[in-house]
Amino acid sequence: MKRVQTAEEREREAKKLRLLEELEDTWLPYLTPKDDEFYQQWQLKYPKLVFREAGSIPEELHKEVPEAFLTLHKHGCLFRDLVRIQGKDVLTPVSRILIGDPGCTYKYLNTRLFTVPWPVKGCTINYTEAEIAAACQTFLKLNDYLQVETIQALEELAIKEKANEDAVPLCMAEFPRAGVGPSCDDEVDLKSRAAYNVTLLNFMDPQKMPYLKEEPYFGMGKMAVSWHHDENLVDRSAVAVYSYSCEGSEDESDDESSFEGRDPDTWHVGFKISWDIETPGLTIPLHQGDCYFMLDDLNATHQHCVLAGSQPRFSSTHRVAECSTGTLDYILQRCQLALQNVLNDSDNGDVSLKSFEPAVLKQGEEIHNEVEFEWLRQFWFQGNRYKICTDWWCEPMTQLEGLWKKMESVTNAVLREVKREGLSVEQRSEILSAVLIPLTMRQNLRKEWHARCQARVVRTLPAQQKPDCRPYWEKDDPSMPLPFDLTDVVSEIRSQLLEARS
């Protein structure tokens, strides 16, 4: 079943088409550090972009972070994600792993990634390898460092804005360390905007990706990651990126004078103002250990892309993920809320309910959908990848599946109730109306997820990475109160509703 684009997606696609039509066969201008106007343009149009050259970052991190990248790569911990774009399942050219606070998730391109936890106090984490544990510890250490640097950068930005000064590109060599500190309230706000709770690690070897797309607006060359805003972040929160390309230092050079535009052998990050065809874009070369920071609302007002070089590259992208609906604690609380309506359980799995109030039933069925499609199916669609690093998610997923199964019994109890003799026509109609939409959505989404697990691209994946259509059961499974395919159930509800209203 083809997913219908959201209004936001349709608007974004329309903007892109209009922009390409305006360009016709011309390229928009962009600047590199060799251009005279580069730093002036950065000063005027990109003042919330902060860059740190590798030489300004502690040598200890430059030793430990690359080792951690290579360790995770050696153990096969990074995976290309199977994402849905415009109704089509495609593998991302970039391999990824999410590391962060235990129980956190991060969603991008309608795909929920689950953290491999970094080692925090009070949480027991069983890693499959001591090397993987050490790597996760390293990224927590990097996270702490980048957090401190981000707060410092935000403080300096606030001082400049308050003084109404012209902002300048904040390269580490000239980065000011003095100044009047912020107020207590401001300090709390700055800390919250740098409270990185996850890092999304990326890896790509361009030699193995010969079909990379060309950058469409400026002619910047091959893109590893297309123009985008980072999704699912706390409003106005910062993003910090540590870049590590695998070439030796002797191969790196800041001399790009022989190239028109950017050096295609060197990785770059590109920036542009969203949907602006007047302001030149920027491309900044990325060498081993360089970092950059997107502060305040830069991620909302500007777009960025990653332009491929010739050598493999890792990056660690630290974010303040918007987790109000994306933590294990959250979804467990939601399950508890839905199951508060259960009066008692019988030995055969049937349940009786406290209330058949339409609002209570509707809420319960919506939570049922949430745990099934935002958690269980998202997790198992990614195969067994998480077990390569840790068993941390095994017990929570078993727990969620048990709670979800009880919700299946709740739905069955509702469907039994509408067939009960003595129920008034009005009550029957209200109950049916309350559950029809969530059950119709459940049926449609089950079809979609089942079809995605059978997609052609899935056949190319190794066994451990193949999507698992879970939960799934056959029609005559005695342990399940309702069928997997709800076509007949939904059809009967519609018929009953028409009958009740006639």
From Swiss-Prot:
An example Gene Ontology molecular-function term: mRNA N6-methyladenosine dioxygenase activity
What EC number(s) does its UniProt record assign? 1.14.11.-, 1.14.11.53
Cofactor: binding comment = Binds 1 Fe(2+) ion per subunit.
Superkingdom per UniProt: Eukaryota
Q: What induces it?
A: Up-regulated in the hypothalamus after 48 hours fasting.
Mechanisms controlling activity: Activated by ascorbate. Inhibited by N-oxalylglycine, fumarate and succinate.
One GO process term, biological-process aspect: positive regulation of insulin secretion involved in cellular response to glucose stimulus
Residues reported in the UniProt entry to bind 2-oxoglutarate: 202, 292, 313-315, 317, 319
Quickly give the catalysed reaction: a 5'-end (N(7)-methyl 5'-triphosphoguanosine)-(N(6),2'-O-dimethyladenosine) in mRNA + 2-oxoglutarate + O2 = a 5'-end (N(7)-methyl 5'-triphosphoguanosine)-(2'-O-methyladenosine) in mRNA + formaldehyde + succinate + CO2; an N(6)-methyladenosine in mRNA + 2-oxoglutarate + O2 = an adenosine in mRNA + formaldehyde + succinate + CO2; N(6)-methyladenosine in U6 snRNA + 2-oxoglutarate + O2 = adenosine in U6 snRNA + formaldehyde + succinate + CO2; a 5'-end (N(7)-methyl 5'-triphosphoguanosine)-(N(6),2'-O-dimethyladenosine) in U6 snRNA + 2-oxoglutarate + O2 = a 5'-end (N(7)-methyl 5'-triphosphoguanosine)-(2'-O-methyladenosine) in U6 snRNA + formaldehyde + succinate + CO2
Protein keywords:
Acetylation, Cytoplasm, Dioxygenase, Iron, Metal-binding, Nucleus, Oxidoreductase
Q: Which cellular compartments is it found in? A: Nucleus; Nucleus speckle; Cytoplasm
**Which co-factor is required?**
Fe(2+)
Which SMART domains does the UniProt entry name for this protein?
A: FTO_NTD (SM01223)
* GO CC annotation, single: nuclear speck
Chain positions with N6-acetyllysine modification? 213
Region (Loop L1) spans which residues? Answer: 210-221
Question: What does it do?
Answer: RNA demethylase that mediates oxidative demethylation of different RNA species, such as mRNAs, tRNAs and snRNAs, and acts as a regulator of fat mass, adipogenesis and energy homeostasis. Specifically demethylates N(6)-methyladenosine (m6A) RNA, the most prevalent internal modification of messenger RNA (mRNA) in higher eukaryotes. M6A demethylation by FTO affects mRNA expression and stability. Also able to demethylate m6A in U6 small nuclear RNA (snRNA).
Q: What's in the domain note?
A: The 3D-structure of the Fe2OG dioxygenase domain is similar to that of the Fe2OG dioxygenase domain found in the bacterial DNA repair dioxygenase alkB and its mammalian orthologs, but sequence similarity is very low. As a consequence, the domain is not detected by protein signature databases.
**In which family does this protein belong, per the annotation?**
Belongs to the fto family.
Q: How does it assemble?
A: Monomer. May also exist as homodimer.
| Record-linked PANTHER family | ALPHA-KETOGLUTARATE-DEPENDENT DIOXYGENASE FTO
What is this protein called in UniProt?
Alpha-ketoglutarate-dependent dioxygenase FTO
Q: Which organism is it from?
A: Rattus norvegicus
Name the gene that codes for it: Fto
